[in-house]
């Protein structure tokens, strides 16, 4: 059984027991979060919502919060001795899918 959920403008394909790194949101460690924005669900037969599947939800448990590896943005203009180096680390909330309710 799997579901396709929408969270903070992105879509994720999830199954029970999966670990996901979602964009950072305010939640306590070990807290339970329910997502009702389920775009599609497959439990033997595919149900596609318009835009969301009615009555479906995905229950998540917050595992921890953290930062991804650093991404380096480097810009250089040739022959001008002009360069710019900048780093970025995305903050995420790691969650575990505990159940999918159709």
Swiss-Prot record:
Q: Does the UniProt entry include the keyword Metal-binding? A: no
One example of the protein's molecular function in GO is: structural constituent of ribosome
Q: Which domain of life is it from?
A: Bacteria
Q: Name one GO biological process term.
A: translation
Q: Which UniProt keywords apply?
A: Ribonucleoprotein, Ribosomal protein, RNA-binding, rRNA-binding
User: Which Gene Ontology cellular component terms are annotated?
Assistant: cytoplasm; ribonucleoprotein complex; ribosome
Q: Which HAMAP family match?
A: Ribosomal_bL21 (MF_01363)
Instruction: Note the subunit structure.
Output: Part of the 50S ribosomal subunit. Contacts protein L20.
The UniProt family comment states: Belongs to the bacterial ribosomal protein bL21 family.
The protein, known as: Large ribosomal subunit protein bL21
Tell me the name of the encoding gene.
rplU
